[in-house]
């Protein structure tokens, strides 16, 4: 039985071979489904998630209301940067997880940069 590997999965593997997060400079990884956006800061050395924010999280659920997906992605980026600053994280390595740097992925990255994270 042949194993089907999508183009995004190939891109994701190629990116992950090149980048890795540490405690001082964790990896900001993004996942998007058709409805929701997920972003987290990962320390690959220890294998731990340091900060996690999603459109499904309780802290954002009330704020989002009836906004479109791109606006919700911006709020995820802002909330992630705020939580990272609270933990003393200033710099990150950006992992787009094989998704095109466009639309919601770009919105999360731009909002995180505006809120003070350095890529």
UniProtKB/Swiss-Prot annotation:
GO annotation terms (biological process): translation
GO molecular function, one term: structural constituent of ribosome
Lineage: superkingdom: Bacteria
Keyword Ribonucleoprotein in record: yes
Keyword set includes Ribonucleoprotein: yes
Family statement drawn from the similarity comment of this UniProt entry: Belongs to the universal ribosomal protein uL18 family.
Main function: This is one of the proteins that bind and probably mediate the attachment of the 5S RNA into the large ribosomal subunit, where it forms part of the central protuberance.
Protein name: Large ribosomal subunit protein uL18
Organism: Anaeromyxobacter sp. (strain K)
């Amino acid at each position: 039985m042949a194993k089907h590997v999508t183009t995004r999965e190939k891109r994701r593997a190629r990116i992950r071979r090149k980048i890795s997060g540490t405690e001082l400079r964790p990896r900001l990884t993004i996942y998007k489904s058709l409805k929701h956006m997920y972003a987290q800061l990962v320390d690959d050395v220890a294998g731990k998630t340091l900060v996690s924010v999603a459109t499904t999280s309780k802290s954002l659920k009330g704020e989002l209301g009836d906004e479109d997906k791109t606006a919700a992605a911006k709020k995820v980026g802002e909330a992630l940067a705020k939580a990272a600053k609270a933990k003393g994280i200033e710099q990150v390595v950006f992992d787009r997880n094989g998704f095109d740097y466009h639309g919601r992925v770009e919105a999360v990255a731009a909002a995180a940069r505006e809120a003070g994270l350095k890529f």
